[in-house]
Amino acid sequence: MRKGAKYTLEFALMADGVAPKDVYKVLASKDGQNRAFKKLDELKPSIQWWEAGAQPPQYLASGDVVMSSAYNGRIAAVQKESNLKIVWNGGIYDFDAWAIPKGLSKEKADAAKKFMQFTLQPEQQSVYSQNIAYGPANKAAMSLLPAAVKADMPTAA
């Protein structure tokens, strides 16, 4: 399990029987947070923590663990050479965002906007997604992706 708060409490609540649709409602309360930490305390002897994205595939391939949370792109990258498969049911989606810091010079802000405009084009997003199995930020890129690439993405449906 990823060593950090991000998604760890969500997985703990699901392990404790909370329906995925109710996780954030439960987690919003102090009792829900305590419930998640209590479940983690219970599971702690069986958890092997990871900090780097490359660790889950290594732990799985070596037999150190029988299942793990992992970045889908890391598992997709080694699927062909291993018996590892992604199980989407019970997974958590993640996303990132571009940001331009307030107070940048006009020149730097314009360069950042130009960079974002380029990288967010469907063609560029398609190249990105074909190199690591993460869904493109621009939905129009999905039609440019081969079916085999789409199969490794949670956003393909």
Range-by-range predicted roles:
Residues M1-E10, Q33-N34, K39-E42, S82-K102, F118-A141, V149-M153:
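Periplasmic-binding protein-like
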Residues L13-G17, F95-E107, V127-Q130:
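A bilobed periplasmic-binding-protein/Venus flytrap-type ligand-binding module shared by bacterial periplasmic
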Residues M67-N83:
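A ligand-binding cleft/hinge motif common to bilobed small-molecule-binding domains
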Residues G4-T8, N72-A76, G91-Y93, S105-K106:
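Solvent-exposed loop/turn segments at secondary-structure junctions
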Residues M1-P57, A61:
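Extracytoplasmic ligand-binding site segments that recognize negatively charged/polar headgroups
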Residues P56-Y59, A112, Q125:
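Short, hydrophobic alpha-helical packing/hinge segments within bilobed ligand-binding/sensory domains
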Residues R35, K39, K106-T119, V127-Q130:
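Short amphipathic alpha-helical coupling segments at ligand-binding clamshell hinges
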